[in-house]
């Protein structure tokens, strides 16, 4: 019998580390396998193993709309109010041949229900409807909470987890056969949902994310990042739902198939929505065309299919015929070590040699400025160290905040959260405290590295359960109870023991980085050779990747970068994959870029040429002391840092890098000899415009956009506080609202924040807003621009009604619309003046409307 993970003490106090709770239960953290699952029958088992197909049902919202559901009705309440309507729709899907019927619980979390019903009652009623319809398998449906997680919003990871766990327990009690987590755009949110499923049930977990036209989720996650992360944290089947039509999703699914061995599923929309002559929302892909596109995905290796918005029982019936005539083919994928943030993958293939630089600067050892920042809780300084290392060429950031006098569990959570909001790089969580390690990796959006485990049995007993449960990578140090051995063979023996112990937890060598531990040449000169030999042995015999803290080799010697760079080159020759080093060291990075050419990692030498075009040999200009000194500077600014591109504006750099900690003081300093509007128009607004360009180019994603907007807000607030009332011009008044019947307001909230930070006065009417309330605000406040948001296809009717009312009563008002179900064409059909694909586009439209 499965025992749910206890995450709170009897008095309700949350436990700092869930692994402690697992141990209280007598549970063991390990990599979950199919044998750990409660699977209803062999057909479902075959689908989870990837040897059989499975057919989910299609759209529910559009079917409810066709059945006459009123605009603004909460679909989950229909399980009580009109259960026969739900059952009739689901019976049509059963008769069409669907294996899985999705319970009508998509929005059945406590946040969305908001007291309208209990989570347990909704799940019980919804599952009863699906059983009444004759479902072979009933899936408990878990959708987004409807609130942004930190650092973009106010909802914590733990609060999200608790909301999902309540749904999971309700689903188990109601008798679901599996869980489907769907329509997620935030990697942290879907991770919380998967963990809630795993830790509160032993049922199979299917998990899908929704992608925009640019191939990324709303928050910038790619299909590869999604698949790697969902695989790592224990989803049994993973994939894509909603988003676009099946033809558009085929390429995204194919990208997932290259990075995971788990079964991949797709539930596409029936194309794009539009309004027919009768005012109904309809979709443009009919059943035969839908099946033709899905057939291509099945040929690629997708084994679980179904439908989303606009699909009907007719669409599913043709898919039934399709999969009945096909057997999944075995998939063969080359293993690799993958480390991810929410937006970036660093991939180290097992059959090749690729270099990933791990930045070492976020470590308080020997760094008084960082030590003081940690004592003061100055995480802005920590973030600045991460940003500078990203700009200097690091691929991964090591994060160590260990000081004896601070609360490491608390600080490492905050540091990783803020770093993920400001940089794109994956993180390596570096701590000797298992509670701190778990606090960080549990809440981390992506697949990180844990630094580290070693050959001591106690350490392996503490760390490997975390690596297994959270699906992370891990660094293994070649030391044990006897210390660091002198010989290569003894170091290898410890590494071999670490790899063998990891295997007991289901952790393969493709998730292990062995660090043979660099000793300083000043006192252990003969050790350099042993270190390199040990690394070669590990690579040849264990199939692992190798890391080294290369800076240690030169400690206590002059010209440290010179000696260190030569050792780094030798280590690359011995098979080093991940040097842990200072990317601000020019000599070290010169060695990295040069080796990437020689190892053919940098094909065509494009990266090398881009970096060194116009390079001057420092040895040839040694006769000129000033030039020689400049050429040999070891930590010249990297491209993108303040001063490197000729732009020394500190406001620009703080806004672009999303650093809000020091911007208030800098703004106050500049106000001493700058006009307030000059500061806004010539410093803040150009910086925000630059961020918008980076966002459009795909170099920034929503977390970075919002971090920059928050930094600008701090600066604007400082100006408003210090300047006399009326001195700062009002750029214009804007009203934003989520339309009647729709309770999803994440996108609207992001637009509001960005427009606020551009200097507009924004009136936020909230969610589920009646058209008359929007009209009243527009008239009373003399609003010139209105932003309307809708996520659900069933609420676009309310959006159209609001637009017609505004244009009739206030002809001069302009209206922007946005939301997952909208397209430029659809927006035009319902009468909107503008369509905004994202928050940055909303800011550009506002500038056009107000002539700024």
Where are these regions (language model features)?
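Domain-level signal for soluble alpha/beta catalytic cores
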Residues: 1-513, 519-852
């Amino acid at each position: 019998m499965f025992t749910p993970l206890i995450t709170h003490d009897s008095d309700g106090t949350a436990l700092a580390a869930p692994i402690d709770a697992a141990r209280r239960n007598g549970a063991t953290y390990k990599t979950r396998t199919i044998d750990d699952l409660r699977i209803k029958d062999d057909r479902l088992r075959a689908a989870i193993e990837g040897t059989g197909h499975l057919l989910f049902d299609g759209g529910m919202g559009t079917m409810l709309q066709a059945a006459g559901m009123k605009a603004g009705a909460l679909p989950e309440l229909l399980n009580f109010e009109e259960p026969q309507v739900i059952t009739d729709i689901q019976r049509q899907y059963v008769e069409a041949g669907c294996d899985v019927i999705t319970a009508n619980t998509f929005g059945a979390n406590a946040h969305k229900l908001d007291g309208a019903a209990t989570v347990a009652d909704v799940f019980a009623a919804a599952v009863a409807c699906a059983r009444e319809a004759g479902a072979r398998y009933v899936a408990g449906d878990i959708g987004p909470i409807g609130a942004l997680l930190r650092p973009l919003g106010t909802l914590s990871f733990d609060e999200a987890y608790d909301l999902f766990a309540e749904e999971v327990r309700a689903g188990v009690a109601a008798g679901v056969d599996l869980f489907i987590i769907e329509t997620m755009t935030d990697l942290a949110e879907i991770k919380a949902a998967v963990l809630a499923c795993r830790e509160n049930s032993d049922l199979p977990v299917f998990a899908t994310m929704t992608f925009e036209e640019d191939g990324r989720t709303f928050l910038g996650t790619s299909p590869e990042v999604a698949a790697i992360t969902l695989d790592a944290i224990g989803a049994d089947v993973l994939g894509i739902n909603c988003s676009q039509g099946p033809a558009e999703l085929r390429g995204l699914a194919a990208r997932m198939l290259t990075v995971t061995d788990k079964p991949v599923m797709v539930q596409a929309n029936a194309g794009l929505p539009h309004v027919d002559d009768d005012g109904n929302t309809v979709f443009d892909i009919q059943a035969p065309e839908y099946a033709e596109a899905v057939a291509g995905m099945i040929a690629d290796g997708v084994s679980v299919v179904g439908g989303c918005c606009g699909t009907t029982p007719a669409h599913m019936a043709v898919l039934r015929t399709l999969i009945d005539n096909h057997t999944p083919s075995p998939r063969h994928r080359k293993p690799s070590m993958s480390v991810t943030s929410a937006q970036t993958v660093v991939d180290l293939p097992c059959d090749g040699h690729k270099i990933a630089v791990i930045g070492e600067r976020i470590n308080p050892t020997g760094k008084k400025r960082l030590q003081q920042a940690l004592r003061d809780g100055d995480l802005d300084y920590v973030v600045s160290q991460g940003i500078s290392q990203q700009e200097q060429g690091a691929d991964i950031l090591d994060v160590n905040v260990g000081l004896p006098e601070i609360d490491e569990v608390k600080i490492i959570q905050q540091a990783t959260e803020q770093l993920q909001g400001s940089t794109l790089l994956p993180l390596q969580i570096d701590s000797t405290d298992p509670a701190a390690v778990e606090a960080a990796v549990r809440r981390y959006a992506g697949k990180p590295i844990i630094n580290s485990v070693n050959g001591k049995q106690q350490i392996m007993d503490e760390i490997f359960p975390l690596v297994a449960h959270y699906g992370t990578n891990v660094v293994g140090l070649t030391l044990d109870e006897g210390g660091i051995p002198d010989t290569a063979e003894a170091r290898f023996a410890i590494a071999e023991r670490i790899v063998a112990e990891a295997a007991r937890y289901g952790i393969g060598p493709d998730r292990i980085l062995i660090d043979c531990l660099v000793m300083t040449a000043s006192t252990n000169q003969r050790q350099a050779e042993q270190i390199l030999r040990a690394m070669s042995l590990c690579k040849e015999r264990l199939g692992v990747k190798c890391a080294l803290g290369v800076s240690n080799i030169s400690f206590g010697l002059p010209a440290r970068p010179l000696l260190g760079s030569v050792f780094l080159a030798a280590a690359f020759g011995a098979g080093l994959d991940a040097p842990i080093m200072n990317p601000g060291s020019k000599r070290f990075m010169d060695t990295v870029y040069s080796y990437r050419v020689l190892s053919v990692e940098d094909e065509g030498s494009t990266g090398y040429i881009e970096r060194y075009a116009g390079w001057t040999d420092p040895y040839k200009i040694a006769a000129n002391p000033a030039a020689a000194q400049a050429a040999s500077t070891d930590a010249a600014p990297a491209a993108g840092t303040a001063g490197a591109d000729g732009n020394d504006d500190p406001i620009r750099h703080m806004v672009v890098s999303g650093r809000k900690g020091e911007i208030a003081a800098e703004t106050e300093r500049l106000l001493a000899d700058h006009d307030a509007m000059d500061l806004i128009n010539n410093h803040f607004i150009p910086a925000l415009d630059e961020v918008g360009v980076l966002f459009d180019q795909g170099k920034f994603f929503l977390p970075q956009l919002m971090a920059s907007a928050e930094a600008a807000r701090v600066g604007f607030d400082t100006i408003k506080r210090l300047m006399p009332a009326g001195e700062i011009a009002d750029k214009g008044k804007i009203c934003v609202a989520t339309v009647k019947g729709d309770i999803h307001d994440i996108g609207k909230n992001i637009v509001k924040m960005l427009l606020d930070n551009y200097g507009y006065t924004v009136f936020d009417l909230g969610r589920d807003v009646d058209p008359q309330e929007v009209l009243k605000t527009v008239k009373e406040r003399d609003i010139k621009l209105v932003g309307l948001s809708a996520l659900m296809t069933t609420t676009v009717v309310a959006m159209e009604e609001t637009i017609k009312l505004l244009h009739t009563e206030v002809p001069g008002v302009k209206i922007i619309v946005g939301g997952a179900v909208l397209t430029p064409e659809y927006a035009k059909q319902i009468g909107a003046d503008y369509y905004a694909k994202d928050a940055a586009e909303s800011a550009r439209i506002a500038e056009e409307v107000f002539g700024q």
